[in-house]
Regions:
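A short acidic, glycine-rich active-site loop
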Residues: 54-72, 122
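Short, flexible loop segments at boundaries between secondary-structure elements
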Residues: 136-154
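Conserved acidic residues
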Residues: 1, 110, 143
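Structural beta-alpha unit
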Residues: 79-112, 117-119, 153-154
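Small/aliphatic-rich secondary-structure junction motif
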Residues: 1-59
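Glycine-rich, Arg-bearing micro-motifs that act as flexible, cationic patches
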Residues: 111-140
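Active-site phosphate/pyrophosphate- and oxyanion-stabilizing loops and adjacent acidic/basic residues
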Residues: 17-20, 78, 136
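General small-molecule cofactor/ligand-binding pocket signal
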Residues: 31-33, 88-92, 147
């Protein structure tokens, strides 16, 4: 079974616990996916163009931003490998909801594991607003079954 695990930088422990109860090691291939969201860059530019003159990050500023994002992505994937050393790491850049669907299809995933929303984003833990837009899109468009991993109530 090919299981694609969607990382957000805070959920690897939760995902590794769920994986240990779902499928035995010998019967699974794990992919750890982290998507660097390009959406905020475009949103900032649209706001800037509306309020001020257009200014696109260029030169050293753009390089710093890209370097920081690449470093964060690698850190998150390395943390994932600490919990699941046999996993394959997959890194993408773009809109997370679309990249997850595309990666699941290209990687031939049998199952996608995703949390309803990042704990850092706040929001309700149950009810219709408890599932964020990324998880909602994945649930609606995935090419395979999706397991939504909610946090345990303490």
């Amino acid at each position: 079974m090919r299981v694609l695990c969607c990382l957000d930088g805070t959920n690897i422990e939760h995902i590794s616990r769920a994986l240990s109860t779902l499928v035995i090691d010998a019967e699974r291939t794990i992919g750890l996916l982290y998507v660097t969201d390009s959406g905020p860059h475009h949103e900032i530019e649209r706001k800037r163009e509306w309020l001020l003159r257009p200014r696109h990050p260029s030169g050293p500023l753009q390089e710093k931003i890209q370097h920081a994002e690449a470093g964060a992505s690698q850190d998150i994937l390395q943390e994932g490998l600490r919990y699941l050393p046999q996993a394959e790491t997959l890194s993408r850049e773009g809109r997370p909801e679309q990249e997850i669907i595309q990666c699941a299809s290209e990687w031939h995933a049998d199952l996608i594991l995703i949390c309803p929303r990042s704990p850092a984003s706040g929001g309700p833990t149950s009810g219709p607003k408890s599932v964020g837009h990324v998880a909602r899109f994945v649930l609606d468009h995935a090419p395979c079954p999706v397991l939504l991993l909610r946090q345990f109530a303490h």
